[in-house]
């Protein structure tokens, strides 16, 4: 079935439109995520557990959209027959699955990271140590590679279907019932964990902000800035988690309402072709592209670099150097801040800036 769908189908004008949509969306996502992955370690604010997890997430997203922008989209647009062979397409499809798993598992860990820092702020640094973060990163990569190779062992390989504009499993020899339930239950677990964790996190942050509004007059400038950063970051994590939930729901459930035939002739006439593509392949690509866009929107440090690309690293981090007044204020309110700060352990760098560091928002 796959050989008919891949190699014996001529590319039409409508196929090239889909290829352009895939390319431009993937390229934007690649630019944003690559910028984040390379630049994040230069920010002292993100030299911590969260920064390392965010870097892994951005790297996975960048490689994922890179494959779509510079392999699948050109193959579809230019109808490159030599690159449509299963031996080549299956390897790139396998790489996409690995990067997708890395991204989604990293999102789960980051959501749990936010949850712990929100409900157990005093224990956060003892839990998310440098060693434990390294263990989590290695585990995410290992599990992602393991699931991909499990599919290969079960003779379940994926290739790009030109008529359907999506990745298809080669069946036979792949037993689709096994793949469906593996993907179905994994998707169900991920959706549940995303929804529950992010709901608790967002509700807790909302309650915290309402409580703080009654005591705003007693907050120092440092505490107000820090709370603003904490609020924006919870909004970022909630937004990214919500997008992944929507993508999983559309891919595994809503798209079933728009079935498409397998035969190329009937598929070309099907009115469900575009809805199925937008709910599956494009939603899959879009969520990885928007990951980087959302991170840039909610983090002023990254936007400052985009506005001033020639500005030195010292100039960008100058606001993090504590003044005499900020050190005096911090020492005076240190005990109160330890009690009231919910996510400070995430946003305050463990570098030599210390507790007096000024959060640049």
Curated annotation (Swiss-Prot):
GO molecular function: G protein-coupled receptor activity
GO cellular component entries: plasma membrane
PROSITE patterns named among the record's database cross-references: G_PROTEIN_RECEP_F1_2
Residues annotated as transmembrane: 20-40, 58-78, 92-112, 133-153, 176-196, 242-262, 278-298
InterPro entries tied to this protein: 7TM_GPCR_serpentine_rcpt_Srx, GPCR_Rhodpsn_7TM
Keywords: Cell membrane, G-protein coupled receptor, Glycoprotein, Membrane, Receptor, Transducer, Transmembrane, Transmembrane helix
Glycosylation sites: 317
Pfam families, A to Z: 7TM_GPCR_Srx
Entries under PANTHER family matching the protein: SERPENTINE RECEPTOR CLASS X 45 (PTHR23017:SF25), SERPENTINE RECEPTOR, CLASS X (PTHR23017)
Protein name: Serpentine receptor class X 45
Organism the protein comes from: Caenorhabditis elegans
Gene: srx-45
């Amino acid at each position: 079935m796959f050989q008919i769908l891949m190699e014996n189908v001529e590319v039409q004008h409508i196929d090239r439109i889909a290829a352009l949509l895939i390319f431009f969306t993937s390229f934007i996502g690649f630019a944003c995520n690559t910028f984040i992955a390379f630049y994040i370690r230069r920010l002292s604010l993100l030299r911590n557990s969260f920064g390392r997890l965010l870097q892994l997430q951005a790297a996975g997203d960048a490689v994922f959209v890179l494959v779509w922008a510079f392999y699948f989209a050109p193959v579809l647009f230019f109808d490159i027959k030599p690159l449509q062979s299963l031996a080549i397409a299956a390897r790139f499809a396998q790489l996409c699955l690995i990067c997708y798993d890395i991204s989604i598992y990293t999102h789960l860990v980051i959501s749990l990271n936010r949850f712990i820092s929100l409900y157990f702020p005093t224990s956060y640094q003892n839990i998310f140590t440098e060693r434990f973060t390294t263990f989590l990163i290695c585990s995410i990569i290992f599990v992602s590679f393991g699931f991909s190779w499990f599919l290969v062992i079960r003779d379940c390989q994926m290739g790009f279907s030109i008529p359907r504009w999506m990745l298809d499993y080669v069946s036979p020899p792949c037993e689709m019932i096994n793949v469906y339930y593996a993907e179905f239950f994994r998707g169900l677990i991920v959706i549940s964990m995303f929804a529950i964790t992010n709901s608790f996190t967002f509700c807790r942050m909302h309650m915290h902000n309402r409580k703080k509004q009654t005591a705003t007059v007693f907050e120092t400038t440092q505490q107000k800035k820090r709370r603003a950063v904490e609020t924006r970051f919870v909004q970022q994590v909630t937004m990214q988690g919500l997008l992944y939930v929507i993508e999983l729901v559309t891919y595994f459930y809503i798209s079933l309402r728009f079935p498409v035939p397998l035969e190329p002739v009937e598929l070309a006439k099907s009115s469900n072709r575009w809805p199925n593509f937008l709910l599956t392949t494009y939603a899959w690509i879009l969520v990885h592209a928007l990951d980087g866009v959302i991170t840039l929107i909610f983090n002023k440090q990254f936007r400052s670099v985009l506005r001033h690309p020639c500005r030195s690293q010292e100039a960008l981090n100058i606001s993090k150097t504590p003044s005499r007044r900020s050190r005096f204020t911090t020492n005076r309110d240190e005990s109160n801040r330890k009690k009231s700060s919910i996510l400070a352990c995430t946003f305050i760098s463990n570098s030599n800036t210390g507790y007096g560091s000024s959060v640049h928002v």
